[in-house]
């Protein structure tokens, strides 16, 4: 398993290189920095949850590839991520079981289905930015990115959607709740100030 974890680091570097070299320059939000952050959070949360080794391997693979589909097809990032998982994992010596479980985790992350602890950890790793002090800057980057990729929405409507999302979102693991830097109410207030 130690060797596989080292191999996952190689996969992470490969995906980050793809973001840096092949991705559209206007991926202001879905970028190498966010991939690194999701991978780090998945690592931290899986260790805190004391997941079995095989679950950690599959979770880390899913974290690496979760956003990779944005490189090839912004409108269908899930499809792109799944294709990349199927293509790259055999090249790196991972089993069909790893491929299927990584794909399941990624699909569940995109549709918001949280059946297992690994699903919950990937969810919390993906949305960790909602509790960060630089949330406003990140949500602004997401708005710019989506606008340039065809989102028809003015800033005020966008901010209302973000407020609603913040209020309805919940971290699913105790560790993620504990690590949250900024409470929901403060983020919503910050959005209101930003809006005015």
Regions found by a protein language model. Give the residues of each.
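Short alpha-helical hairpin
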Residues: 2-21, 34
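Amphipathic, well-packed alpha-helical segments that form the structural scaffold of globular domains
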Residues: 16, 39-43, 86
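Divalent metal-dependent phosphate-bond-processing catalytic cores, especially two-metal-ion Mg2+/Mn2+ enzymes
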Residues: 23-55, 65, 94, 111-196
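Short coil/turn segments at secondary-structure boundaries
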Residues: 29, 68-76, 93
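His-Asp-centered metal-binding catalytic motifs of divalent-metal-dependent phosphohydrolases/nucleases
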Residues: 38, 54-73, 81, 103-110
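An active-site-proximal "capping" alpha-helix that borders the catalytic cofactor pocket
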Residues: 38, 76-92
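P-loop NTPase signaling cores
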Residues: 92-98
